[in-house]
Amino acid sequence: MSDKGMMVGWSKFGDLGLKFSAAANNSYNFSLIDNSGVDKAAFKFLTFPDKCLISGPSQIYCAVPRNQDVFSRLVFPDDYLKRGVYFQDGIYQIDLAQNKFQTLFQEESPLIDAVNLKISGNRLLFINRYDNRLYSLAIQ
């Protein structure tokens, strides 16, 4: 795998990953890949692997920037990694087996730009890039 602007985040078992990469005409792709780098699913939204967690074979949690248009105006992932851009995220639970997309957080306040998602019991933990504090959301 050698796509331009590529970022990959692997599941804790190393069998699945989430890949962000540049495509033609200043567009980007975000997809689920296997351990050979083969696309298993393409998502209709854009986000970065460090804003997601693969928690099981068909469960993914993602913080997704609400303003998807920003991806056409900036250079990614460079601007993001250099902290030149911050997002206002919605947080979602994705069930690939049942093709479900459940909203966990979509409030206007506080501003959330979530990274480093982890599960602890029935809580989704993450760091908010705005203040570098630990936050949590109840999950089912």
Annotated model-derived regions:
Residues 1-20, 45-60, 109-125:
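Conserved beta-propeller blade repeats
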Residues 1-6, 32-48, 95-112, 140:
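Multi-bladed beta-propeller domains
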Residues 8, 27-33, 62, 89-93, ...:
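Hydrophobic beta-strand positions in blades of beta-propellers and related beta-sheet-rich domains
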Residues 19-20, 63-65, 127-129, 137:
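Residue-level marker for isolated small/hydroxyl-bearing positions within beta-strands
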Residues 22-28, 82-88, 130:
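Short, solvent-exposed loop/turn segments at conserved positions within beta-propeller repeat blades
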Residues 29, 35-72:
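Active-site/pore-lining binding-face segments in mid-to-C-terminal subdomains
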Residues 64-86:
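Short, conserved, GDST-rich strand-edge loop motifs in beta-rich repeat architectures
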Residues 116-140:
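C-terminal amphipathic "assembly/sorting" segment characterized by alternating charged
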